[in-house]
């Protein structure tokens, strides 16, 4: 939610730049603030999605402890933002860290001057969350499969119902797999091209 609000607050600046034929009218400080806010919000959004996948996995693995996890959501969110702001604030020590990206009508990291930063940013805020998301949803799918097998063993009473119940379990597993594929797919479609483009431009 905070990520979306932060990104939304920066949209008027880009609109003004488009209207002004690509001229940035908010000064160097405005560009730094805007570039930092957009970068931090994108990173926080990736990690938030990652934490959601971990929370879902824990909820399935330990259903009776789910209420305990919910109580700590606020504190986890604070730690998340502290982590994101801490490693993104490194660039604030450099005057030319954020510049106007003319093709996008917005301010962002100075990719050409600080390629190492872009590489590390992609590793920490794109690759690592993606690995965790893929891993947790694969584990979720395996847990659903195991759970369905246990239900099948405990509920099958006769040969006549066995086939129907197994078909139902297979259908449930397939639907769970589709959800996993959709979530991971959307994440990758949204962020991998952006990350690859930044890396290619930096190198």
Tell where the protein language model's regions lie, with residue ranges:
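Helix-loop boundary elements of multi-pass alpha-helical membrane proteins
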Residues: 54-75, 145, 167-176
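Loop architecture of class A 7-transmembrane GPCRs
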Residues: 18-35, 39-40, 62, 68, ...
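Intracellular effector-coupling site of seven-transmembrane GPCRs
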Residues: 142-194
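Internal alpha-helical transmembrane segments of multi-pass membrane proteins, especially GPCRs
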Residues: 1, 42, 74, 78, ...
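Hydrophobic alpha-helical segments of membrane proteins
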Residues: 5, 9-12, 86-89, 93, ...
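Structural signature of the GPCR N-terminal helical module
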Residues: 1-30, 36-37, 43-61, 79, ...
